[in-house]
Amino acid sequence: KKAFMGCSGISMLSGMTTEIAAEVKVNEVMIQNVTEDVYLLADHTKIGKNSSFTSSPIQGIKHLITDEKAPQDVLDELRSAGVLIHQVHKGDFER
């Protein structure tokens, strides 16, 4: 089982965060029940941001799917922590 999850923010300092306290327990249960990897989906506005509640430390996230506007310095930090970065480019969807 894989998990594809959203968040309010992701950073080296706080890991995967949310603004909604009730989401923390749901996210923790999802992560605990994964037999493969956790894929976090976060657009550039959430990269390097810390929200109120931590759902997972950065070590619990194996993949980050984000867009081409994500700050490269933060992506490099996440990469150095073992997170695999998958950047989606607008041109990928144009015909």
Which residues does each predicted region cover?
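Conserved phosphate- and dinucleotide-binding cores of soluble alpha/beta proteins
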Residues: 1-95
